[in-house]
C-alpha cells in the first residue's frame, strides 16, 4: 500500500461514473499499511497501527486475515510463514529460514517475533483477532474477516454484533453464518454468470454479495444484474486501471491497496 492517491487522482477516480450518484464502500486491504522505497514496512500490514491509520484516513473498514497458531490461537497474518512481515524480536534481524505459523505456539510467536517496521514503536507482536477487533471498535470502523476459521466468525459476532463482514468462499459455510448473524456476507468467487451468482446469493439470504480478484468478470452488464437484484459487488485488489473501470461498471465495494488522502472519506461518491 505504498502507492498514495493524490487528491486529484482520487477525484478523477470518484467521478468516473456518468449520469448517476451512488456510494462505494472503501476498505483497506490488510489495513492501511505502507513501505519505504527500500521495501521495509513503515506501518505493518495486518497490525493494530494499520487499523488506526485506516480510520485516520477515513476508510469505512479494513480487511484482515485470520489463521491459527500451533495451539489454536487466532492471530492476524496473511502468509503461512512469518518471513515477509516479521523479524526476530531479540535483535530485529531478518528470518533466514522459513518460519511457519502452524509450527509456533502462541507464546513462542509473541515472545520471539515482532512485525517489521522502520519505526521501533511499531515493532509489535503479531496481533490476535481480539486485538484487531477491539481496535476496529475503538476507531469506529468495520472489520472484514477473510477467514476460513469458523471460530473467528463467532468471536466477531460476539464483539461487533452485526457490524462486521464475513468474506470467504463456500456457500454452505455462509448459510451457516447467516443462521446466527445479520452481518454483510461477501462470497469469494472465481467464475459464474451473473444469474449463477445471484442464485448462490439467494441461498445465503440477507445483505450479501460477491467478491473476486478476477477483474474480467466485472463487466457493466454483470455488475448491473447483481446490483439490480439487490446484491453487493466487491472489487478485490484490482490493478489501478481495472479499479477505475470497475467503479465505472457499477461495483459497490472496493477493497484496495491504495492509500486514500487523509480525511473522512467513509464512502466514495460517484456521479
What are these regions (language model features)?
Residues 2-10:
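Sec-dependent signal peptide recognition
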Residues 10-18:
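Hydrophobic h-region of N-terminal signal peptides that target proteins for export
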Residues 19-271:
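Phosphate-group recognition and catalysis centered on beta-loop-alpha active-site segments
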Amino acid at each position: 500500500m505504498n502507492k498514495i492517491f493524490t487528491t486529484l487522482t482520487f477525484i478523477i477516480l470518484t467521478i468516473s461514473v456518468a449520469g448517476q450518484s451512488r456510494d462505494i464502500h472503501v476498505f483497506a486491504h490488510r489495513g492501511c499499511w505502507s513501505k519505504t522505497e527500500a521495501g521495509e514496512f513503515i506501518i505493518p500490514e495486518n497490525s493494530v497501527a494499520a487499523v488506526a491509520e485506516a480510520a485516520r484516513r477515513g476508510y469505512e473498514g479494513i480487511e484482515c486475515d485470520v489463521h491459527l497458531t500451533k495451539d489454536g490461537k487466532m492471530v492476524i497474518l496473511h502468509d503461512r510463514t512469518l518471513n515477509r512481515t516479521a523479524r526476530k524480536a531479540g535483535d530485529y534481524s531478518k528470518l533466514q529460514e522459513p518460519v511457519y505459523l502452524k509450527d509456533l505456539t502462541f507464546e513462542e510467536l509473541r515472545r520471539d517475533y515482532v512485525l517489521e517496521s522502520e519505526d521501533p514503536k511499531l515493532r509489535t507482536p503479531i496481533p490476535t483477532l481480539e486485538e484487531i477487533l477491539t481496535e476496529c471498535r475503538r476507531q469506529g470502523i468495520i472489520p472484514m474477516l477473510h477467514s476460513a476459521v469458523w471460530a473467528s466468525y463467532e468471536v466477531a459476532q460476539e464483539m461487533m454484533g452485526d457490524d462486521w463482514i464475513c468474506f470467504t468462499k463456500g456457500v454452505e459455510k455462509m448459510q451457516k453464518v447467516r443462521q446466527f448473524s445479520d452481518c454483510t456476507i461477501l462470497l469469494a468467487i472465481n467464475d459464474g454468470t451473473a444469474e449463477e451468482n445471484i442464485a448462490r446469493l439467494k441461498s445465503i439470504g440477507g445483505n450479501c454479495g460477491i467478491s473476486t480478484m478476477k477483474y474480467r468478470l466485472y463487466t457493466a452488464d454483470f455488475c448491473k444484474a447483481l446490483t439490480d437484484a439487490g446484491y453487493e459487488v466487491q472489487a478485490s485488489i484490482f490493478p489501478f486501471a481495472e479499479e477505475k473501470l470497475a467503479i465505472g461498471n457499477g461495483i459497490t465495494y472496493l477493497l484496495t491497496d491504495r492509500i486514500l488522502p487523509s480525511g473522512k472519506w467513509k464512502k466514495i461518491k460517484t456521479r
